[in-house]
Amino acid sequence: MSSAPDPFQHEVARIALAVAGRHGFALAGGQALIAHGIGARPTEDVDLFTDVDGGVTAAAELVHATLLDAGFQVDTIAEPTELDDVFYGFEHDMTEFEVRRDDRTVRLQLVRFARSTSPIVLDVGPVLHLDDVIGTKVAAMVTRAQPRDYIDVAAALGRYSRSDLVDLALRADPALTDEEFQDALQRLDRLPDTVFALYRLTPAEIRDLRHAFSDWPR
């Protein structure tokens, strides 16, 4: 699969970052991986992270108004995000929007989250440093264990060793344990190939994904 952003999601991210960047926000999540040239799986949301206290509150209305001015429909989402299942406390400093135009919809999340390295600037705007993106992705694989998490981490194994990935995950979430890592790999073994096919992986790509984790402890 080629690594290219979805044009609609890329536009939403670019417009939001143009005003949220002043409050420390940078592109995170699957969109950030694509911006760094890693992976190309379909994504359902746009994640923007800041390490600035009060940044979410300061940017939320600005982002909302700017997207409206750009011709999007924007609604605030009240229910808790699944990100709170990955990192404790996300619901206490975050805002989520549903952004629509014509028949396209994407969820936009503004989140307060610590980072270890300064973001870089790419064509979309500020993007989390790859180490920070990967750290959150591996932590998500361990705690959330969704098929997309394994896809993202397997793609990162082309640039990072297993040891490096574990270290970055522990930097993002120091509470992770060896047992949780092992449980995550056991869950991978139980997942049927059909769940990965939903992300447009071919049978050969699914085999490669499983092989990428073959030497991880279970």
Q: What name fits each language-model region?
A:
Residues M1-R218:
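Compositionally biased terminal segments of proteins
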